[in-house]
Amino acid sequence: MEGIFYALIPMFTWGSIGFVSNKIGGKPSQQTLGMTFGALLFSLAVWLIVRPEMTLQLWLFGILGGFIWSIGQTGQFHAMQYMGVSVANPLSSGSQLVLGSLIGVLVFHEWTRPMQFVVGSLALLLLIVGFYFSSKQDDANAQVNHLHNFSKGFRALTYSTIGYVMYAVLFNNIMKFEVLSVILPMAVGMVLGAITFMSFKISIDQYVIKNSVVGLLWGIGNIFMLLAASKAGLAIAFSFSQLGAIISIVGGILFLGETKTKKEMRWVVTGIICFIVGAILLGVVKS
């Protein structure tokens, strides 16, 4: 029970990143740079307190992983700009779970028993149904929907999902480091990635500075993710953390004024239920 409580913290902190950053404002590149600065400050503080042993391998893979992460985060910020937070974030979380699970099954053979394939396939089906309903648009809301560019949003989500899943595979399946050890090299890679996406034209303005708060949310989520994994297992902790999409949906509607018709609200609730059940089933399969 304690582990599940810890897992709820990254659910809220990571789920809040999208609407908090969009409430602050700025371009996706400014949002990413500000977030990575905050993450770097948080990581430096953790390093000064913990003083973990640092190896060359840890630095190299940590920086590489952070750079790959920045691809995922920049794409997600672009997707939120094109589609809205309440649509983009659940699609992003769900697509990460689906693609990550498929890679785990096909490449790393994480499912070995028949029951795992049955329950896992049901979980993936529920996530796909959740995709459909969370992004489904009502024709009656066309005046609002025309302000969004869903084709660009889906393209941004595609490379965002690839970046996030590559990052997850690197640290969960290929190289396994302690989070408290790798968090600083990873933050350095995140900053380098953000600077690259700005074409090395760094401009520290109010949006970059304010978005550093979002980096603190990321860091707090990482610490509690570590605690949750130690108490309840990584599979359960990760699956629960991905339910932050629910926080994104609610935050986008309440704090960013993203409008939904009654029909769209019913679809959103259906999508949320599918996400919750699908994510929990995936956690059960992996554990």
Curated annotation (Swiss-Prot):
Keywords: Cell membrane, Membrane, Sugar transport, Transmembrane, Transmembrane helix, Transport. It is a multi-pass membrane protein. InterPro entries: Sugar_transport. GO terms for molecular function: carbohydrate transmembrane transporter activity. It comes from the Bacteria. One of its GO terms (cellular component) is plasma membrane. The chain crosses the membrane at residues 1-21, 30-50, 52-72, 88-108, 114-134, 157-177, 180-200, 213-233, 236-256, 267-287. Its main location: membrane. The keyword Cytoplasm does not apply. It is found in: Cell membrane. Coiled coil: none annotated. Belongs to the GRP transporter (TC 2.A.7.5) family. This is Putative sugar uptake protein SPy_2205/M5005_Spy1856. It comes from Streptococcus pyogenes serotype M1. The lineage of its organism: Bacteria, Bacillati, Bacillota, Bacilli, Lactobacillales.
